[in-house]
Amino acid sequence: MTASQTGPTTTAIAQRASELRQLLQQASYAYYVLDQPVMEDAVYDRLYRELQDLEQQHPSLITPDSPTQRVGEQPATGFESVQHRIPLYSLENAFDAEELRSWDQRWRKLAPDVPADAGYVCELKIDGAAIALSYENGLLVRGATRGDGTRGEEITANLRTIKSIPLRLQTDQPPEWLEVRGEAFLSLTRFKQLNTEREKHGEALFANPRNAAAGTLRQLDPRIVAERQLDFFAYSIQGPNDWANLDQAASLDCLQSLGFRVEPHRQTCPTLAEVEQYFSDWDARRRDLPYLTDGVVVKLQSRRLQDELGFTQKFPRWAIALKYPADEAPTQLQHVTVQVGRTGALTPVAEFSPVALAGTTVSRATLHNADRLRELDLHIGDTIVVRKAGEIIPEVVRVLTDLRPADAKPVVLPEKCPECGQPVQRPEEEAVTRCVNSTCPAIVRGALTHWASRDALDIEGLGEKLVDQLVSKGLVNAIADLYRLDAPLLASLERFGEKSAQNLVQAIAKSRQQPWSRVLYGLGIRHVGSVNAKNLAATFTSAEALAQATPDELAAVYGIGSEIADAVHQWFTVATNQNLIAALEQAGLQLHGEAASPRSQALAGQTFVLTGTLPTLSRNEAKALIEAAGGKVSGSVSKKTSYVVAGEEAGSKLEKAIALNIPQLNETQLLDLLAQAEG
């Protein structure tokens, strides 16, 4: 009996399944991305059912990009924390044209030769949840939340249910890997439908579409995510080689060609004046859109310029979010409290009658500092106008002085710290008033909480409530006191049993093994974040070496500028801090590290500066190769620079190198030099 007499062959079935997948993917793309249906719903449903039946009969035919795999898997038990291949930076915010111009002036100081009409790309900022998508050879392999920017939660199963996210890229020649960033959101229509359904079932209503989208993505059951019908706009693409060199507008066009939805109202603006006009136009029109937008993202068009400007620890220097004016509401100021932070900064906080703003109820707002108090001329009992800056953070905008009670008393910052009673100081050229008493309970509490945080010493179980008890009972007056605590003493604390006490003692003991870079970050030196701490610890491999470094030596470290260098140098001159270092060393903390061991010393003593875009290497890759050969990479050109490695469209660093007669290398010459160093 022949195969034709018994039914279709396995090959024919596989071909039909492949054909169905392609037809359904094309129809889904046309419907959800282009909004141009090419197939009636009934036809789509019939083809979908045919593919579903084939896959049920032949499970080996199921592929990760099959439309049937969007429906949702079985509920998960939790989300795994995953490392982003490329960090998800947040954006600096601007709330008016003046702040936008200030940003523009800042980046131009770093790239002074860029013409006035450098070019900007304006994109509407979607009010949703930031998402990172990872593709390998064209297939979606992972999706994650932003998290802290470095690590997020892996929610691939949930993201597969969003029909505007392609499971397979629309290209015959996909790169080995591709990272796509974008915003998952709920349309206003779907948001209203969901709240209507929840109200019928007696469930709590979502406060706003952003909260609904973020909460939906963290559902353990993908079937719930599928039911809520999230949408997605892509706004960033990163990949190897040519994929990494697209200018901003071209990168958005590329995303669209790969099958992604991209917010359609983007615009290239040659000048900042046109950016401001775009923002003004959309501020008036934004409520006509079918989804929420809370501002305009302004990015430099040139990818070369983006690469040259790079990032701060938190933001890209080449982009900013220009936020719309928020909704405002009047309320009555009841009183002002003063908080003391871990650096001793006094922050006045307005306490006012609860008021609804942007979907949430607020009753407190920071007043920042004494200057802001003076500008507002606040009096207790005033009627104040409150808004949400960026529709997230409450702030006091102005005072309605015509409504001020006759007996209202002005608000002023105290001359003594509300926590310890010691006189406060306001250093010259600073807006912040500070308590400088290192034993102030508020400063000690803040220092302990920071020391125990995940990126510092990572002491599990040492939370804010326990820290409050330890400080209020006088058991801990400085970080080093933690290492004298024992289990019986801890077990005597409120709501703290023997088991918890034993666990905390073990966690504190374990923290003695944390590396020098974490200890340095845990010290809480102003301006020294975890990245800067790693860079400093790699260069100065002990607390003693760091303490003896001059400001110039500190500023020469990659990523460290004069402000950070001065803060570090000043910290080590304070006697209290010197005593703390000695006590930590006695307690067994790691105040010594090991310098990164280069594979060779062939480039020892030579300093390199990187500028422009290299053909195949990223800056971090080039830096790692140089350091592995014993060389040093600096962020600025000086007479001590040995070589400047210049890529395409190198900027002012190359010009300075030429003026100083410093040798220049291209990528090929750098690789040749490194090859010689290897042997």
Swiss-Prot record:
It catalyses: NAD(+) + (deoxyribonucleotide)n-3'-hydroxyl + 5'-phospho-(deoxyribonucleotide)m = (deoxyribonucleotide)n+m + AMP + beta-nicotinamide D-nucleotide. Zn(2+) binds at C417, C420, C435, C440. Residues 598-679 form the BRCT domain. It comes from the Bacteria. Keywords: DNA damage, DNA repair, DNA replication, Ligase, Magnesium, Manganese, Metal-binding, NAD, Zinc. Its EC number is 6.5.1.2. One of its GO terms (biological process) is DNA replication. GO terms for molecular function: DNA binding; DNA ligase (NAD+) activity; metal ion binding. SUPFAM superfamilies: BRCT domain (SSF52113), DNA ligase/mRNA capping enzyme, catalytic domain (SSF56091), Nucleic acid-binding proteins (SSF50249), RuvA domain 2-like (SSF47781). InterPro entries: BRCT_dom (IPR001357), BRCT_dom_sf (IPR036420), DisA/LigA_HHH (IPR041663), DNA_ligase (IPR001679), DNA_ligase_AS (IPR018239), DNA_ligase_CS (IPR033136), DNAligase_adenylation (IPR013839), DNAligase_N (IPR013840). The keyword NAD applies. NAD(+) binds at D41, A42, V43, Y44, D45, S90, L91, E123, R146, E183, K299, K323. The active site is at K125. GO terms for cellular component: cytosol. Belongs to the NAD-dependent DNA ligase family. LigA subfamily. DNA ligase that catalyzes the formation of phosphodiester linkages between 5'-phosphoryl and 3'-hydroxyl groups in double-stranded DNA using NAD as a coenzyme and as the energy source for the reaction. It is essential for DNA replication and repair of damaged DNA. This is DNA ligase. It comes from Synechococcus elongatus (strain ATCC 33912 / PCC 7942 / FACHB-805). The lineage of its organism: Bacteria, Bacillati, Cyanobacteriota, Cyanophyceae, Synechococcales.
